[in-house]
């Protein structure tokens, strides 16, 4: 039996399964990768919004990471919601010890409902502790604005933001997601690396059920990097995956429902049992 590749997510929770660690693990599974999860925050949230947040002490995060890394090494790592500077420093310690492992940052700052998930001091700390270590960062437009300080209202500003990530912050790659711009029927994303800029376009689906799209998108990139894919290939797969997951949303909950993490499997005919 061939051992599966392993992807590790370090993020907050969502008891309704649409975002955070829960969404990441489902996305890993759908990509054929074994998922592991370290919890940073217990988040009481649902499709209607965020009700309560309980950030774990950084020592508890350290204990979880120690359990993982003392037993096995993941082939790729992603971080999502990290609400305190101490926890960022804890995670940085492990990343510095394993610099060869691909690292993806989903800089979770706002919930889909608009609720803030990170204070200003922690946002500043993110730029100095984790972003310079990232193989790729996956901000949406509001997150890119928060990190760069720009008002991104044009393609020119997106290009400027991308250069800030690469040339000033020091990230190896960044994909700025244009899904929050409702100006066109096309969702256009921009991948920046030291080699230049590449764009990805997909149809924009008119639906409110997009809870957890950022988590899912970055998780698929992480899973594909764990399998040894090149960054461009990983992003290309993630774009197809997220488009299908939005197109076939399960319409769960009374608010902004989650995407369908198993739509890609269904399309490929790999998981017919899920519908039984």
From Swiss-Prot:
EC code: 2.7.1.49, 2.7.4.7
Pathway given in the UniProt record: Cofactor biosynthesis; thiamine diphosphate biosynthesis; 4-amino-2-methyl-5-diphosphomethylpyrimidine from 5-amino-1-(5-phospho-D-ribosyl)imidazole: step 2/3; Cofactor biosynthesis; thiamine diphosphate biosynthesis; 4-amino-2-methyl-5-diphosphomethylpyrimidine from 5-amino-1-(5-phospho-D-ribosyl)imidazole: step 3/3
Keyword Heme: no
InterPro entries for this protein: HMP/HMP-P_kinase_dom (IPR004399), PM/HMP-P_kinase-1 (IPR013749), Ribokinase-like (IPR029056)
Tree of life domain: Bacteria
SUPFAM superfamilies: Ribokinase-like
Any Pfam family: Phos_pyr_kin
Keywords: ATP-binding, Kinase, Nucleotide-binding, Thiamine biosynthesis, Transferase
Catalysed reactions, semicolon-separated: 4-amino-5-hydroxymethyl-2-methylpyrimidine + ATP = 4-amino-2-methyl-5-(phosphooxymethyl)pyrimidine + ADP + H(+); 4-amino-2-methyl-5-(phosphooxymethyl)pyrimidine + ATP = 4-amino-2-methyl-5-(diphosphooxymethyl)pyrimidine + ADP
Enzyme class, UniProt record, top EC level: transferase
Record GO terms (molecular function): ATP binding; hydroxymethylpyrimidine kinase activity; phosphomethylpyrimidine kinase activity
BP terms from Gene Ontology: thiamine biosynthetic process; thiamine diphosphate biosynthetic process
GO cellular component labels: cytosol
Binding site for 4-amino-5-hydroxymethyl-2-methylpyrimidine: 45
Function: Catalyzes the phosphorylation of hydroxymethylpyrimidine phosphate (HMP-P) to HMP-PP, and of HMP to HMP-P.
Family: Belongs to the ThiD family.
Protein name listed in UniProt: Hydroxymethylpyrimidine/phosphomethylpyrimidine kinase
Organism: Staphylococcus aureus (strain MSSA476)
Annotated gene: thiD
């Amino acid at each position: 039996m061939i051992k599966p590749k392993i992807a590790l997510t370090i993020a907050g929770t969502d008891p309704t399964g649409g975002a955070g660690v829960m969404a990441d693990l489902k996305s890993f599974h759908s990509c054929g990768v074994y998922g592991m999860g370290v919890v940073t925050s217990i988040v009481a949230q649902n499709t209607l919004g965020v009700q309560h947040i309980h950030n774990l002490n950084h020592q508890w995060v350290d204990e979880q990471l120690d359990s993982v890394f003392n037993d096995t090494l993941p082939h790729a790592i992603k971080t999502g919601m990290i609400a305190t500077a101490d926890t960022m420093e804890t995670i940085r310690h492990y990343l510095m010890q394993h610099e060869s492992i691909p690292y993806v940052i989903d800089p979770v700052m706002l919930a889909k409902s608009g609720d803030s998930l990170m204070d200003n001091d922690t946002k500043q700390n993110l730029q100095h502790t984790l972003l310079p270590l990232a193989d790729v960062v996956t901000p949406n437009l509001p997150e890119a604005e928060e990190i760069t300080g720009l008002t991104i209202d044009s393609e020119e500003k997106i290009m400027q933001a991308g250069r800030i990530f690469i040339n000033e912050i020091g990230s190896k790659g960044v994909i700025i997601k244009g899904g929050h711009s409702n100006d066109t029927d096309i969702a256009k994303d921009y991948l920046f690396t030291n080699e230049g800029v590449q764009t990805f376009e997909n149809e924009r689906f008119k639906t409110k059920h997009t809870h957890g799209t950022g988590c899912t998108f970055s998780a698929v990139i992480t899973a594909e990097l764990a399998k040894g894919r090149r960054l461009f290939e990983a992003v290309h797969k993630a774009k197809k995956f997220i488009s299908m997951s939005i197109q076939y949303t399960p319409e769960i909950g009374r608010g902004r429902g989650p995407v369908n993490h198993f739509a890609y499997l269904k399309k490929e005919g790999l998981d017919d049992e899920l519908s039984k």
